[in-house]
Amino acid sequence: MFLNGQGGQRPPMVAFPPLNVRGSISSGFNALGRSRNNSDAMDIYTITDRGPAAERDPAAGRWHANGSPSINSTSSKNPDRYPCYQENGRTYHGYRKGIYMLPCDEQEQDRLDIFHKLFTVARVSDGLIYAPHPTNGRFLDLGCGTGIWAIDVANKYPEAFVVGVDLAPIQPPNHPRNCDFYAPFDFESLWALGEDSWDLIHMQMGSGSVASWPNLYRRIYSHLRPGAWFEQVEIDFEPRCDDRSLEGLAIRQWYQLLKQATEETMRPVAHNSRETIRNLQEAGFTEIDHQMVGLPLNPWHEDEHERRVARWYNLAISESIETMSLAPFSRVFGWPIERIKQIAADVKSEAFNKEIHTYNILHIYQARKPLAN
C-alpha cells in the first residue's frame, strides 16, 4: 500500500500482508555488548547485508573525515556511572533514568534490528536513505539504538564518516573504522557536535522519546551544512481499517491507552504528519518531501514482495505490543504486569486475525536546509 504524501514521487513502496510469525529472535548478545556472531533461532546478521569487522581498527574514534574533528573530541560520559536497572522483568538504562520508556536489553535490541530490516525492505528504491547525500560526507544518526543503520551506511559508503548517538551504550564494538558511536548522549540536551558541519542527519522511530519536536528540529537545522538534508522515519501506530469499525476492539483501546500514558509523560508516541511538516517548515527547512507506506497486520495481498514486508512487520509488531506497554502502563496507570500481559495478548490475537484488516502507516520525511545566500 503506497500512500502518496507531500512532495516528489518515489517508486511504489508496499508493506503488507503480515504472516503469523510469532516467534522471538534470540542471539548471542549480552545485555549491553552484542557480539553479533551467534544466534540460537536466527542470526541477526541475516537482517542486513553487513558482516562483523574482523577486528576493531585502532584508529577508530580518531579518524578524521573531510578534515573534521573526531566525535571523541567532544566531552564523553562514562556509561558505568549510570548502571542499568530492572523493571517488570526487563532491563532499562540508567542515564536520564525514567525518561525513556523502552528497555535496552537483548530482547529490545533484537526488536530494534527487526524494525530496521522492515524499513529496508519496505523502502523499495533505497532501504537506507532517500535524501540526496554525498558518498563521502558526514552523517549523524540520532537515537541510533544498536547502531545498525549507521553501520550499514558506513559499509555502503566507506569514504563517509558516520556517527550514531543514543542514550544507551548498546552499540557493538566491532563496527567499521569510518563509523563511531557516542553514548550515553541525550539529543534533547546541548550538542557538542559542530554546527553547520553535517551532510545528512537521520532519525528513525523517535516518537515517544522527544518532548519538543520544534526544539529538536531547530537543533538539527543548525547542525546541518547549508544545502544538506534531514531524513526522518516514523510509524504511526494508530490502528486503521478501511472495511470495518475498530470500536470495541482491544487494539483500539491499547493504542488510546498508550497515547494517553505517553502524553502524560510529555513524550507522546502518537505521530502527526501535518504537525511534523509544520514544525519542519517553522524550523527553516525547505523542499520537504513526505511519503507514506501502509503496514497491514493481516495477509490479504498476493504479491510476494508485499508478503515479505508483511512478515517483518508481523514479527516487529508482535515483539512490540507488550514492550511498548510495560513502562507507560505500569508507571502512569499503576497496572500490574499481569494486566499488561493480558491486554498485550488480546491485541496480538486481533492483530493476527485475518478477518480484521488493520494497518498502520510508515512515514518518511526528507527536509533540506537552504543553501546560504
Swiss-Prot record:
GO terms for molecular function: methyltransferase activity. The gene is laeA. Disruption phenotype: Reduces the production of the immunotoxin gliotoxin. Reduces the production of endocrocin. Affects transcription of numerous secondary metabolite biosynthesis genes. Decreases spore formation and germination. Reduces virulence in a murine pulmonary infection model through increased phagocytosis by host macrophages. Keywords: Methyltransferase, Nucleus, S-adenosyl-L-methionine, Sporulation, Transcription, Transcription regulation, Transferase, Virulence. This is Secondary metabolism regulator laeA. CDD domains: AdoMet_MTases. Its EC number is 2.1.1.-. InterPro entries: SAM-dependent_MTases_sf (IPR029063). It comes from the Eukaryota. Signal peptide: none annotated.
